[in-house]
Amino acid sequence: MTFYSSGEEAQHQWKQLQTQQNKKNSPRPVTSSRDFRSRVQGNQSNTIFTHLTKSAANSQCQLQKDLKKTLQLQHFLQTLEQKTSPSKHKRKRTKYRRTKKSKHHSRKKTTSSSSSSERDSTTGRESESS
């Protein structure tokens, strides 16, 4: 315990009062990241926040209804297009295949004597085989 004279004592008490008042407002050293965050963010009140207000909730419901209608209309359109458009896989097949017409090859004309002998030789062969 220290003893002060009356003037010194008054000054000492006055300094203590000033330091006590300043301690409330004076900065404290930051000891942790949690302490730092609490100082930066400040005091947050414990209020309950709603994500959507009434008007926003109503607009959200309306948007969902419109989305359902749009999806239904798209599905309906696809089914109509499938029914009305000719299908690529449902082509009718012909019953009988068309035969290719054989091309007639023209023979070179040769002398009449040689052509007649060729005809005779071919007919002779045919008659021999039959």
From Swiss-Prot:
Basic residues: bias regions: 86-110
Compositionally biased tracts (Basic and acidic residues): 117-130
Region annotation Disordered: where it falls in the sequence: 1-47, 78-130
Compositional bias (Polar residues): 13-33
Name of the protein described by the UniProt record: Uncharacterized ORF3 protein
Organism of provenance: Torque teno mini virus 1 (isolate TLMV-CBD279)
